[in-house]
Amino acid sequence: MIIKEYRIPLPMTVDEYRIAQLYMIQKKSRNETHGQGSGVEILENRPYTDGPGGSGQYTHKVYHVGMHIPGWFRSILPKAALRVVEESWNAYPYTRTRFTCPFVEKFSIDIETFYKTDTGENNNVFNLSPVEKSQLITDIIDIVKDPVPPSEYKTEEDPKLFQSVKTCRGPLSENWIQEYKKRLLPIMCAYKLCKVEFRYWGMQSKIERFIHDTGLRRVMVRAHRQAWCWQDEWYGLTMEKIRELEREVQLMLSRKMAQFSEEGPSELSKDSATKDQASGTTSDPGSKNGEPLGRGLKKQWSTSSKSSRSSKRGASPSRHSISEWRMQSIARDSDEGSEEEFFDAHENLYCTEEKQAKDMTKWNSNDLMDKMESPEPEESQDEIYQQSGSEFRVASSVEQLNIIEDEVSQPLAAPPSKIHVLLLVLHGGTILDTGAGDPSSKQGDTNTITNVFDTVMRVHYPSALGHLAIRLVPCPPICADAFALVSNLSPYGHDEGCLSSSQDHIPLAALPLLATSSPQYQEAVATVIQRANLAYGDFIKSQEGVTFNGQVCLIGDCVGGILAFDALCYSGQPVSESQSSSRRGSVVSMQDADLLSPGTLANAAHCSGGSGGGGSGGSSLESSRHLSRSNIDIPRSNGTEDSRRQLPRKRSDSSTYELDTIQQHQAFLSSLHASVLRNEPSSRRSSSSTMLDGAGALGKFDFEIADLFLFGCPLGLVLALRKTVIPSLDVFQLRPACQQVYNLFHPADPSASRLEPLLERRFHSLPPFSIPRYQRYPLGDGCSTLLADVLQTHNTVFQEHAAPSSPGTAPAGRGFRRASEISIASQVSGMAESYTASSIAQKGPSSLNHTPSIRRLSLLALPPPSPTTQGPRARARQVSPNLERAPCLPDLDIGEVAAKWWGQKRIDYALYCPDALTAFPTVALPHLFHASYWESTDVVSFLLRQVMRHDSSSILELDGKEVSVFTPSQPRERWQRKRTHVKLRNVAANHRINDAVANEDGPQVVTGRFMYGPLDMVTLTGEKVDVHIMTQPPSGEWLHLDTLVTNSSGRVSYTIPETHRLGVGVYPIKMVVRGDHTFADSYITVLPRGTEFVVFSIDGSFAASVSIMGSDPKVRAGAVDVVRHWQDLGYLIIYVTGRPDMQKQRVVAWLAQHNFPHGVVSFCDGLVHDPLRHKANFLKLLISELHLRAHAAYGSTKDVAVYNSISLSPMHIYIVGRPTKKLQQQCQFITDGYAAHLAQLKYNHRARPARNTATRMALRKGSFGLPGQSDFLRSRNHLLRTISAQPSGPSHRHDRTQTQMDSEQRGQRSMSVAASCWGRAMAGRLEPGAATGPK
């Protein structure tokens, strides 16, 4: 539901407005009623008492809107649904209006209006609660300034030009509001609270936005301009005269509508009468309403669509009943299981009602009005989804650029960008778009998916908030001409009244094929590349992107996906030739074809040029000639000619072909895949090749693309045509310049097609990967999308179809894309997946020269091969131990599939859609499915899992083992207590588990507390918590130990049973709340007796500043190096603090931010009076009960007494701060900083290695992860730009030690650092696959 408050100031009194409004309504009803499909019927108009607002006038109308609804939408609605029922209660200065629609139960428009004598500055006219006010979007309408579509503009209705004859008012200036206030002239404001709801699958956001912007705002702007400019007609009228006019109009409309439908009015009147009889007292609703102004208006005041349907039950099936069933089916689907909290879609997506309205209604409807440039015919059938064919204009100004330039004049001082992932939405619309519709529809879809991203991240991916940016790249409507052409070929095209039959007959699959065969397709791809570079450049110049060094991903919809693919194919060509070479971008290996007949072009047996997908684009013009020998003057290009020179336009005969256009088109199509065909063994070089370098002007992307996401794209059909036209071309050779392609589609979408069978035919036997429902698995279901896992899981399929032929190899002509280690990681969701998948394609070092499809960036992630000669099976076992468990495929088949693949994961992904959609008219499905992608939480959560990592343990060990993927053992369930759902509506999780230390022969106990809110405002009481532990970290399996129930204080305590007793080591622990999948992370450290440890007081020894106003303190220079030194010596690191455990997430995030080594962290149990006593008791517990030994301690002067209490030698107590005589003999003061102290420890032999060898083996070297920071994967080119901007020289390192800088550089050079395997993740929403990132 979208809720907006419109404020409309007018230069008149409230009483005058009442007359003007009533007169305007009756006049417009009279003038705009044309009959069937467009008109108004007034069924009832009577006074009422004691109703909404007290006493007033009740009106019951029916609007026939069939001619104003898009054709595809009209085809799925029952005939009765083409009427909108209006019920209004007018009690000035308050009115209420409700619109409903028969047979469309989940649709309603509710408008509440107050009329005040002000200029619209009252911010709480409707007495909304704070929660309701936070949901509200305010939109001020100015009848003078707000633009009007050219098709609706009339000079006599322009307030800037109109002057009344009767009142002498007007014209109005643009500052009329200020002028009227200053001169104390009459002025009033209409406050309209509008709530629009259309709860149907796939259409909700788009339809609700369309109703607000076109059905409400646009209508209100025009109507209020008319109310002012028609004042000479209504000024001086009385209410009696208005009522008389209304009766005349009611009689006239009933007669006019009866001419077109003898059944419609009477039938609806019958339904209305039935409603009145059934409801009894509904004609006087205010009698039961305690609110005098009618704020409690409910649905029983509206015409009951259920009673309307009841009169038709039992009748034989008809188109009417089928259409009714269609809408009911998708409505039921949207509310499936709504009685259960967990399965309620709205409650699941939005934690609170406040978030629901706030997040989904951020789009400003002024964008629509500002972009209306061209007249729109009223008879336009697809107004909602039509796209504008006008040029895209960049919304930037000189002033903004000047500000940006001033801010980035010193790039070295610029803070790092918070944006880690940039999503460019290539929006081209559907294949049925005519290209002449609403220009803001593209931006509206982009805003919709942006809001869904924000909502999903806020609920389940909080660490990603603020780190993802989305920008629109509008694409030309390339299918518009093809759609217009094919529409004229329909056998029903002559019958305008048979819209459904004529459009259903359109062969949808032919539209993208025709579009990509058009000579204008080259310009479309060039335009997309240019606009994408422009959008990226504007983002880089903006404040949030000036230091951007993250990854860029493309999202292509039905049409935009085709353009994105071809743009990536061209961008991926190696630039080996010079810019001026005539061979650059051309295909030099071709075959001449035999001559056929005059005027006919013959395809070569192995013609070149990756066709854009059309019949005319399939052949190269150089591969064919006209029979006419007079065509000898077709120019030939050679190595010395300028590739940019245009062909002479001379003809020696009347050829029917525009050779210039066709040759440029052919050159473009060929250049798309020139690197593939250049090395075709079947092709021979021809010095007489004449391919223009027409694609040279296309340009390339100015940035590296990580992933390409396709939404319902018919790319498979286009590539299948290219394969048909060029039989020698293997589709897998058309490799786009990105690391992974994701083809998302709904199985019932007629526009979509699969890609995997084109790359490997045996995949036709496998279903596409099913994306889990967000409502049930908000963080994924843990199923692997890796190609390696698919090949092993379905090994029988590939073995049965295995052919004895040698594995295919990708052409060597395509150069490698050099990538950084960060780019390696971004290939797949998680580091471990890149290891597994890339290892499959590895055939040995020698194969690199022959199989460029096996990317070097994949091999860089692998450990160097053993110098000893090993068979392929042995190598496979080394790099992927998991493959040993399943029967292995022959390496021949594995290598063949991996060499063909566009990435290292599955490519085809199927989304859920209601089964009832298969019964919908075909013409309606492209629009419906296209709208569903932008508001789909399934799509958004899947995208998030691909582009980001959540768990710090997603980094690999030095030995190259895979990090285990965590998957929730149980799906979400309903809360055990009904009150829990209400208590947690507006609070975030703040769960924590105490770091546990145990002996291998003693009790191993883990305790946790589950709270919500930053100050533990809400306790999770009586709810289920699942306990998981990783048995053999980091590559072991997550084991579900037990399910606990929290007590009244939100605590749980679990003792690991003897059957699962842990040996010496550090084990990650997760406790997951069953009701909402929030979780807490911690570790249990099992140690042998006699283990030595070094203790650090966090605030006393690390903090260099005091935390004021909630800001994080600075870290003392060199502190991290000292802690790491003791860790390298084999000591257990203990961190103690007097802070309450409710701050655990914040403190651990601070430790992770500064790369402190991993250790056990001890917090106070809530707010305590004596935190020093807590520190002492914790250390005494370690020594007395666990038999550990303290070797050294660091802290402030306050900590001296704590360390003395555990009998620690003064020589091993190190205090940071000014020396005092009182403590001179009790400790060692660090006066020259940690750098000097570290030098003393190293070179004066004051620190010896730990004595317990078993402990040193168990305590692996590692650091805290980065909780609270979504560690997005970075692309190579942005890293290079960032590195080049880093300050150089030792003078810039005064705040950071040498070791810190080196560690970060090592982290950039190799992501296989053991440290983060033991990273600690901030308690947040659980991400299945957290260990290696998303699946």
UniProtKB/Swiss-Prot annotation:
Subcellular location per UniProt equals: Endomembrane system; Cytoplasm, Cytoskeleton
Extent of Polar residues compositional bias? 275-286, 1298-1313
Give the start-end ranges of region Disordered. Answer: 32-51, 262-341, 606-657, 861-880, 1282-1313
Write out the GO MF terms: metal ion binding; phospholipid binding; phospholipid transporter activity
The protein's UniProt keywords, in alphabetical order, are: Calcium, Cytoplasm, Cytoskeleton, Lipid-binding, Membrane, Metal-binding, Methylation, Phosphoprotein
Family assignment from sequence similarity: Belongs to the PtdIns transfer protein family. PI transfer class IIA subfamily.
Q: How does it assemble?
A: Interacts with CPNE4 (via VWFA domain). Interacts with PTK2B via its C-terminus.
**What is the name of this protein?**
Membrane-associated phosphatidylinositol transfer protein 2
- Protein's organism: Mus musculus (Mouse)
